[in-house]
Every structure is written in structure tokens, then in C-alpha cells.
Amino acid sequence: HMIMIIPEEEYKNIPKIKPEIVKLVKETKENIWVHIKTPVDLWNYGLDSKYEFLDAVSASFPIYDNGFLGALRVANIHKTLVLRKFEKYVASYVIAGSLVRGTADKDSDVDTFVIIDDTDVKKMTRIDLLDRLRGIIYDYIREASALAVVKNILNVQVYLLTDFWQSVKDAHPVMFTFIR
């Protein structure tokens, strides 16, 4: 499979682009399926809970990358590490910021936030739990950056589920931005 991610403003040109790409692929005499997508298409796969497609794109071997794929790759590797450690406690792992808005460049940071379900934790205070979780999750940032071999800085905000919902009830503007 070959996936070509084009800017959103080029969406209307897909009927012109696809035949050219298919012609180039046929010249190679390889059996390659061509998929042309936009970043919005990728985010919609995530919204539709089709994470395996995003995983495949982030694990791909890019022929050309303007920074989008590298940023997606480092976030996906970090997500995998966090899920492996806290599997049943991760309520949400979300990519936000310029990457999702489509304004990121190759040097842009990658904004993510993780919401951890703390509702069954009884043996430590929420502050102690949050400090411990942040330490582990921040250690995974270094590991993900090394594995992804990208320069994009991964910024991770860690929230406990009870604190997140309390902030939503208090109409905290940051939480409403995340929900949007």
C-alpha cells in the first residue's frame, strides 16, 4: 500500500492527482494500492475508533515527510508505551494543538494529553498518584523520541479522570478546548 497525504486545500485535486500516481505505480510493475488522504481524513479515522489505520500510517516508511508523519510517529510510539504500562487505566490519549489544526511544520512540538482513570486508587493521594504517573509517562517521552528518530518535542499533559471531570464541571476553559 502507498498512502499519500496531501494538504487539505488540495482535496479537490485528488481526481487529477490519483491518475498520475497510479500511472507512476504501474510503471514500476509492482502491485501497489494507492490511497490519497488528507490530515482531516486521518483524524476522522481516530474519531471513528479506527486506530489501526493511524498506527499503520505512523509506522510507515516515509518517502517524503514535511514533519507531519514524524510528529504522528512519536506520539503513536509514546501512546503505545503508555498503553502497555497502564492498559486498563488510560481513559483517553489525545493529540491536540497545531498538528491537529493543520498548522504544524517540521519543527513543531506535538501536544498530547493523557487522562488516567484514578477512580479505584485508594492507597495514595491524588497528588502522589499524579506525581508518580507523570514521572513514568515523562520517561516514556525520551524513549519514544529516541525510537521515532525525530526532532519534534513531545509535550504531554497528564490528568486524573476525577480532576478532569471536576475541571469540566467548573467550566475550565482548557478542558473545553480539549473537548472541542
Regions found by a protein language model. Give the residues of each.
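Catalytic core of pol beta-like nucleotidyltransferases
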Residues: 6-96, 100-107, 116-180
